[in-house]
From Swiss-Prot:
This is Scarecrow-like protein 26. One of its GO terms (cellular component) is nucleus. Its main location: nucleus. It is found in: Nucleus. Expressed in seedlings, roots, leaves and flowers. Residues 184-251 are annotated as: VHIID. Residues 267-299 are annotated as: Leucine repeat II (LRII). GO terms for biological process: regulation of DNA-templated transcription. InterPro entries: TF_GRAS. It comes from Arabidopsis thaliana.
């Protein structure tokens, strides 16, 4: 990324950036920061959206401007946000939060570009990150400052991880499991982000197995298994006769995720078994340990007459990182089981491999800015619970995503097109029911008005915050399955 040298130093070392001085930085397209009329009292994510628009002044001269995702229009010039792109617009009396917020976005993008761009420089990256750490902390008073702190920490971890001199010094933040679960539960109460996928997938499963006596769910990444308690309760409530439906869950774990992951899957099984016993749900649980990321149906215990359901939650908060090759191996093998239903839930982050790391970084910043805005609408930044969730949960979540988007372009490209992959590899879409759509909308009614749900074709639903898509759920079956 090319910054005029003197202007970048002013941006970097100043404790109060004058927008008029910063406006001297002009792109090769003739746009300058003076063209941006920004009201930081409104949603700060719109600054990122303005950078991602065709008029953005942040991209390298030789690269294409980052396009808007999902064919969304009007984001950069929304009258409701006070942000517009026009020639000759002058800044009024600068506000501290406005100047600092804009400067933080510049520095974050500069750090990302310096860490992976054509002119990659570890020393420049280190210096920019050191400056960012001076400017922000996770306990700051604005959304932008706190979000910048989490991205700064995530970029710092990447820098440490890639260090040739001292790779052993890199350590991930480790929090007590009870704190992590508490933070996760708080997030569920603050936002529909997680429960949206759980709810829509569970409803689709209930509908698909309505007349089946034995149900076998193969769960790609079970985590704490919180999704299945509600499914058990629903099965019990409708099983009024003597022949109750039997539920069996097979949870996968991988040696590549370490002993802690294996132990967590086993503990999840104990909790689910105890819960099933307490409500009278016939239940069995198997733990399938994989030595590698490759999956084979021969490792499963299959029972004649069971309706097989494949549950695939990808890269949601608290879910382990799995490579595209691991997901492809799982879904390819799962197809041979002729599953009654495949549920696929994933975050709507634009990860087109051919766009490069900087594009992916900007889109990730865009994604989390929308998440922070949605949290602010439901729980003030001054609330201690909000800080707890950010520290224990959201910070590691940001860091994990930054790790994913640094993968090579060919690998990253797979993340963006799972529905397309399913449709071209022997799976057929299953239509979302009217009941499922209504339940999703009912869930959103419990939260702030900024959340929305839209249909994704005939077989999917998308959770969004204002103009930004956050999470999608889609439903499939093997082409050989008779519905």
């Amino acid at each position: 990324m090319n910054y005029p040298y003197e202007d970048f130093l002013d941006l970097f070392f100043s404790t109060h950036t004058d927008p008029l001085a910063t406006a001297a930085s002009t792109s090769s397209n003739g746009y300058s920061l003076n063209d941006l009329d920004i009201d930081w009292d409104c949603d700060f994510r719109d600054v990122i959206e303005s950078i991602m628009g065709d008029e953005g002044a942040m991209m390298e001269p030789e690269s294409e401007a980052v396009p808007m995702l999902h064919d969304q229009e009007g984001l950069c010039n929304s009258a409701s946000t006070g942000l517009s792109v026009a020639d000759g617009v002058s800044f009024g009396e600068p506000k501290t939060d406005e100047s600092k917020g804009l400067r933080l976005v510049h520095l974050l993008v500069a750090a990302a570009d310096a860490s992976t761009g054509a002119n990659k420089s570890r020393e420049l990256t280190r210096v920019i990150l050191a400056r960012l750490k001076d400017l922000v902390s996770p306990g700051d008073r604005t959304n932008m400052e706190r979000l910048a702190a989490h991205f700064t920490n995530g970029l710092s971890k990447l820098l440490e991880r890639d260090s040739v001199l001292c790779p052993q010094q890199h350590r991930d933040d480790v929090y007590d499991q009870a704190d992590v679960i508490s933070a996760f539960e708080l997030l569920q109460n603050m936002s529909p982000y997680v429960n949206f996928g759980y709810l829509t997938a569970t409803q689709a499963i209930l509908e698909a197995v309505k007349y089946e006596r034995r149900i076998h769910i193969v769960d790609y990444d079970i985590n704490e298994g919180v999704q299945w308690a509600s499914l058990m309760q629903a099965l019990v409530s409708r099983n009024t006769g003597p022949s109750a439906q039997h539920l069996r869950i097979t949870a996968l774990s991988r040696a590549t995720n370490g002993k802690k992951s294996v132990a967590a899957v086993q503990e999840t099984g104990r909790r689910l078994t105890a819960f099933a016993d307490s409500i009278g749900q016939p239940f069995s649980y198997q733990h399938c340990k994989l030595d590698t990321n490759a999956f084979s149906t021969s490792s499963l215990k299959l029972v004649r007459g069971e309706a097989v359901v494949i549950n695939c939650m990808l890269h949601l908060p608290r879910f382990s990182h799995q490579t595209p090759s691991s997901v492809i191996s799982f879904l390819s093998e799962a197809k041979t089981l002729n599953p009654k239903l495949v549920t696929l839930v994933h975050e709507e982050v634009g990860l087109m491999g051919n766009q490069g790391f900087l594009y992916r970084f900007m889109d990730l910043l865009h994604q989390f800015s929308a998440i922070f805005d949605s949290l602010e609408a439901g729980l003030s930044i001054a609330n201690p619970a909000r800080g707890f969730v950010e520290r224990v949960f959201i910070g590691p979540w940001v860091a994990n995503w930054l790790t994913r988007i640094t993968a090579n372009d060919a690998e990253v490209e797979s993340f963006a097109s799972w529905p397309q992959w399913l449709e071209t590899n022997g799976f057929k879409p299953l239509e979302v029911s009217f009941t499922n759509r209504c339940q999703a909308k009912l869930l959103l009614s419990l939260f702030n008005d900024g959340f929305r749900v839209e249909e994704l074709g005939q077989n999917g639903l998308v959770l969004g915050w204002k103009s930004r898509r956050l999470v999608s759920a889609s439903f499939w079956a093997s082409c050989q399955t008779n519905q």
